[in-house]
Every structure is written in C-alpha cells, then in structure tokens.
Amino acid sequence: MAIVTVDFDGTLYKGDSFKIMFQIAKKEYTRKDWVPVTVGLGKAGISGIINGKNAFKKEFFKAFAKGFRGKTKQEMDTFFEKLVDLGKKEVHTELIDRIKEHQSNGDTIILLSGALQPFLEAFVKEVALKDIHIISTTLTYYPNGVCTGELGNIVNGEGKVAEVQKWIMRAKKEGLISNEELNEIWAYADSETDIPLFHLADHPVVVNPTPAMKQVAVNNAWSLF
C-alpha cells in the first residue's frame, strides 16, 4: 500500500487545461467579464518582468478567474463540463490504466494540480476514476453560491509538497491512511516545477518528459513513463 500523487497538466492530461479554458472563455465571457481580466493581465505582465515566467502565469491565472465573478455554481459547473468535453481527447489513457493498477493494490490516489478543482472533479467523473482525492486550486463562492472570482491557494511547485504534507497529516489523524502507506510515496508528474515533489517521493516517475526534463530524470535515476 502506498500514497500515489498524480499531476494533471502534461501528465494525466496531455494538454494544457488553461489553454482550453481560455478557448471556452472566448466564447462564453461577455465584454464585462473581460474587463477585470484585461486589467489583471497588465499587473501580470509587470509581475512577470520582475519575478519571472511562473509569477506571470500565477497572476494571469488570478486575473482570468475574475471573469467568473457573479456566476452561479450551476453556470460554473456547465462551464467546466464544456472544458472536459473539449479536452477529453487529450487524456493519457495508459496512465489511467496505471492508476487503476495502483488502486487494485490498495494504494491511495491523490490528483495533485494547480488546475481548478471543479474542472478536475468533472474530468475525474468523465474518465470514470473513482475514490480519487483531489488537491488543487479552488474557486471561492459567496454563501449564496455565487462565485467571487477569487482563487484559493494556487497549488504549484513547492506548494504541492506543502499541500501533500498537510493532507497526509490530516488523513493520518482522521485514520484515512495507515503508517504503512506513509513509507511509500509515488509521484507522477512532467515538469521542472515538480522537482520538489519528485524529491519528496520514494518513487518519482517522470511522465511525457521534454528532452531537458528527460535528462533531469536520467541524472537522478528517476523512472520514465
């Protein structure tokens, strides 16, 4: 028995969930929705110049989410269902099979991603994966069920390690995982931002690697998938 973390973009999903989200938004967003996004994009550009590419991505993600402000939970669910319908052809079917193998061995599966949680929930349902724990970026809602347009903590890089460790502590306290599972952690992911997670894992597995990431895997004697 083990804990198995699986990244989403570029790993379980071969594409980029933000790109397809942007495609849907171009059809669904009104001019009013785009106003805060455009303002936020300017701030993201400044952040990118000062702090680099990853900082730009995070700020743009936050800006984009502001276009969701005022939408109901039902409207958001419909939006993410359209995302899944557009992106489902990019699912990594071989990795789906590997996940099911892990489950047959009694392993605990965590889908760990910076992607939005409602999208991942819809995706997992579409590909018929069951008993999956999801740690990802959340959208916040007002008590009346209307989206605030604000994100929770963006789960990326070192943040993934912190979130997994918090989840493990909570799950152990609640009796959801055994001490035996804590002795074996797997990590399936694809990018350089996942290197901290790979170092946490007993079994790092680099999925769909770029040439540069493949070399990193070889240098560290990590498995390839």
Locate the predicted segments by residue.
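C-terminal cap/substrate-recognition subdomain and adjoining C-terminal extension
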Residues: 1, 78-79, 85-225
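Short, surface-exposed helix-loop/turn micro-motifs enriched in polar/charged residues
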Residues: 13, 56, 111-112
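Catalytic cores of large soluble enzymes that bind and process phosphate-bearing ligands
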Residues: 13, 68, 156
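Amphipathic alpha-helical interaction elements
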Residues: 26, 65-69, 125, 205
